[in-house]
Amino acid sequence: HQQAGSCRFLWQRDAQDSFFGASPERLLSLRNGQIRSDALAGTAGRLETGESLLNSEKDRREHELVVQAITDHLRSLGLTPRRPRRPQLARHGQLMHLHTPITAAAENQLPLFLAGALHPTPAVAGLPRRQAIGWLRSLETFERGGYAAPIGWIDSAGDSENSARSSE
């Protein structure tokens, strides 16, 4: 199963139109008052070794920017994020990514508010967020559509899961 551990989704708009995917990039999972967000930045093909990715200064720096942005956003909401010191390797299909799971206790938090605070991560939009989004809009001659949009679900207990991005 190539997408084990991915944020999997299916959205059926009507009988003729469905949107499904399996993104390795989980923007937010909220279960029983516990948040998890997956920082995923720094990518290499399967032909490279995991050690080369873990030791790549460029990829580690990019990855740490994403980790720091997510933890800063969670702190700004009054939460106390926890994370491992070093990233792990996550394999998805033909790619390997640097991956850091970030967790926090989040009693009485609204999933849509949390997702809105975290989206877009620097892995999607860049840094600083507002300037990067403006720069991308001025350069890109196409609409990203659903590519950079989070997608997910919320249940009646307030638990949820949202992918950071997908493709149409």
What is each stretch, according to the model?
Residues R13-F19, I70-T71, P87-L95, P150-S156:
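A glycine-rich phosphate-binding loop feature that marks nucleotide/adenosyl-phosphate handling sites
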